[in-house]
Amino acid sequence: VRHTLFETPSARGLTDAEMAAPLPRVRAVLFDFSNTIFEMINLETWLHRVGTASGRLALLDGHDAVAEISRQLRTAFRLPAVVALQEGRDLSPERHYRAMLGWWEHVDFLRGVEETAYRELTAPDAWGPYPDTEPTLRALRDRGLRIAIVSDFAWDLRIHLAHHKLDGLVDSCVISYEHGREKPDPQLFFTACADLGTDPRAALMVGDNPVRDGGAAACGLRTYILPAGSHSADRGLADILRLVT
C-alpha cells in the first residue's frame, strides 16, 4: 500500500495498480450546459419577449429602460433574502421557480408578470449553442468519443438541445433536478460515467465553474475549466480536441 503524508482529496479510492498505471486515453467528454456549450438569449431580447407576451412592451421604449432594469436586477440579486433563495435552487423546478419570483418581484418591469417571465426563460428557444458548440460535438463524435451533459439545471434542458437539433450528439444528460443533487456532488459525475460505460479516469469534464465543475477532479476525471466567455463568440471549445488526441 502506498502511503503519503498529504492525501489528495478524492471521492473515488484508487487501487495501487491504478495509481501506478498511466492514465488511459480520454474516451468520453462530460460538458456543463449553461455558459459552457449553451447560453441564454441576451437580456434585451428576453425583456422584449416578456414585454410582448405581457403587454408591457411600451415600457421598454425609453432610452435607458433596459439599462435601468439591468441595474435593478443586479441590485435585487444582492439582497440577503434573494441570495438565500438561490441556495439549492437547481434541486427542483419548484425551488428554482420560487428563487426567480423572489428575485424578480423587486424589479419594476417584472413585478406582476413573473409567471410570463419564467415561461420566456424556459422556452425551448430561450437558450442557444455557442458558434463552436456543434462543430466541437461533431468532431468528438467523429473521433468515437461518448458525450454527456452534467448540469445544475431546474428543468429538462433536453428541450433546448432538441430545438437546435443537437440532441443526437449527446448520449446522456445528468441534470441536478432529476437527481436531487447539485455539483460538485460526486454522484452526478459517477452517474454520467456509468451511463457512458466509461471509467472516470478515461473521462474529461469541461465546465466554467472551478468549484462545481472542478469537483469532477476528486472523482478521478480530468477537468478543463473555461474562462468567463463573451456573448456570441466562440467559447474556445476547439481547445478540447487537443486534450483528447
Language model segments and positions:
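Asp-based, Mg2+/Mn2+-dependent phosphohydrolase catalytic module
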Residues: 1-31, 40, 109-112, 134, ...
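N-terminal helical cap/lid subdomain that shapes the substrate entry/recognition surface
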Residues: 2-134, 143
